[in-house]
Amino acid sequence: MRVRKRKGAQEHLENNPHYVILEPEAAKGRWCEVFGNDHPIHIEVGSGKGAFITGMALKNPEINYIGIDIQLSVLSYALDKVLASQAPNVRLLRVDGSSLTNYFDAGEIDMMYLNFSDPWPKSRHEKRRLTHRSFLDTYKQILPENGEIHFKTDNRGLFEYSLASFSQYGMTLKQVWLDLHASDYQGNVMTEYEARFAKKGQVIYRLEATF
């Protein structure tokens, strides 16, 4: 979903270099230095307005989190949440999900999250889906052996596509939820969109897969 352009968004990011890594190429291979510790690093590709990444950071202080989004205004709203939370273990990047190997070394990321990604329903846009094989190639390079992807969506078509994509890639589907909010799954942290969908009674799909 697109967000209306936010005035001053660029300046907002530039004025907060502690949380927003403005030159992420320079951090490649040295993210432990950026965070000041050697804790595991989890990333969310398509972090939206930051509810999930901030919530996870507060819930798990022993894990470092990086929220990634290419949309300037969206990332500025995520920064608002990070600043309000004062979570020391979260950083933000404005980069494209297809270029992650420019910013992370092999195996430097321990886990990644894909939450409510754009489904790109038209066949001609298949390669833009974040669970397309080309993206999986990228994710595999920055995750360790048996690295995990946790995926959530309200879009059944994208969920079915992703199940097939992960399986055809040779990944292992650890767990699958066909109605997350009706399940006994504990510890779910919702995104802004997820909270909105939940109020409408929409089904949320979730899976965990490993390389």
From Swiss-Prot:
One of its GO terms (cellular component) is tRNA methyltransferase complex. One of its GO terms (molecular function) is tRNA (guanine(46)-N7)-methyltransferase activity. The keyword Lipid metabolism does not apply. InterPro entries: SAM-dependent_MTases_sf, tRNA_(Gua-N-7)_MeTrfase_Trmb, tRNA_methyltr_TrmB_bact. Gene3D superfamilies: Vaccinia Virus protein VP39. Pathway: tRNA modification; N(7)-methylguanine-tRNA biosynthesis. Keywords: Methyltransferase, S-adenosyl-L-methionine, Transferase, tRNA processing. It catalyses: guanosine(46) in tRNA + S-adenosyl-L-methionine = N(7)-methylguanosine(46) in tRNA + S-adenosyl-L-homocysteine. Residues 124-129 are annotated as: Interaction with RNA. Pfam families: Methyltransf_4. S-adenosyl-L-methionine binds at residues 44, 69, 96, 118. It comes from the Bacteria. The keyword Oxidoreductase does not apply. SUPFAM superfamilies: S-adenosyl-L-methionine-dependent methyltransferases (SSF53335). The active site is at residue 118. HAMAP family: tRNA_methyltr_TrmB. Catalyzes the formation of N(7)-methylguanine at position 46 (m7G46) in tRNA. Belongs to the class I-like SAM-binding methyltransferase superfamily. TrmB family. This is tRNA (guanine-N(7)-)-methyltransferase. It comes from Streptococcus equi subsp. zooepidemicus (strain H70). The lineage of its organism: Bacteria, Bacillati, Bacillota, Bacilli, Lactobacillales. The gene is trmB.
